[in-house]
Amino acid sequence: MRLLHPNPAHDLTYNDVFMVPSLSAVASRLDVDLATPDGIGTTLPVVVSNMTAVAGRRMAETVARRGGLAVLPQDIPLDVVGSVIEYVKQRHPIYETPITMSPSHTIGDALGLIHKRAHGAVVVVDDGLRPLGVFTEHDAIGFDRFTQLHAVMSRELVTVPDGTDARTAFDLLSTNRRSMEPVVDGAGRLVGVVTRKGTLRSTTYRPALDADGRLMIGVAVGINGDPDTKAKALVEMGADVLVIDTAHGHQTRMLRALEVVRAVAPSARIVAGNVVTADGTRQLVDAGADIVKVGVGPGAMCTTRMMTGVGRPQFTAVMECADEAARLGKHVWADGGVRWPRDVALALAAGAA
């Protein structure tokens, strides 16, 4: 990317910038490769922020299945983080994870959970995880909440064999006029479910997978306490990315935390931030960061700039930090300031990975 008017008098935010179109050989939006160059292994340049109300196991599973990465918050107990990592690593990279219940569960039980899945169904299974039927909200019409599922579920199942490719699965759903069907292994046990939308999306998006073909997940680490001890434990649990995170990343405590984490996890992919200057980027890289997180106060819900007077327009911050990171053979993530889809494209144009 280059600026048509180099050396602007003021720093720029996303609202100040437009991209000028030029000659392109890309015939379709589906021909655009969005795989990230930062070495993480994601195929989509989207990271779910390490916020308690945002990043959890379902978000991590779903986003990784589409090629992105979710970062678990730093304030979650370590044993819970371990269980979430284990859960995500056990999910199928293509098939969606259904809600399962036994035949003796009630309509009330099912209705309390059914909205946690976009496909709007519960798979009723026996003790051996073999599908017996499917329950949807429509099946509850005319029955009270205490009616057991075996009395109302649809037993007309068309199961999909494990290993079926997306196109074949879509054809099976279309032929049988179903929006969702269970996927079973050779022993008839439930592996997951396929949906029409899911099969279509899996032909467009590639999942973010680790070296063992499992979904990827990141975890945040604070700079206080014993970041090295926590980082070592997270790597042993299977975390693919460590994000050393604090609001003001250009400080000596961050640099010390980075150094000790790098010492105990020499091969880990480490992200650190947040900073908004080339100097901050350089010092984080020198301390051990592979990727630098850029942004102080650009978020739509963030009041950092208003309350403290600290920050920098995001487009200029990303551009400057990305240039410095590239000079050092590293990369940056643009953190915050995205209010419109265009802002993602502008962040990538500015140099974000």
Identify the residue ranges that each predicted region occupies.
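Conserved active-site-proximal phosphate/metal-binding subdomains
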Residues: 4-9, 303-334, 338-353
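Bateman/CBS regulatory modules and CBS-like beta-alpha motifs in cytosolic regions of diverse proteins
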Residues: 23, 28-51, 80-119, 124-126, ...
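Glycine-rich phosphate-binding active-site loops on the catalytic face of alpha/beta enzymes
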Residues: 65-80, 239-251, 290-308, 337-353
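Catalytic beta/alpha-barrel core
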Residues: 71-76, 100-101, 121-123, 159-161, ...
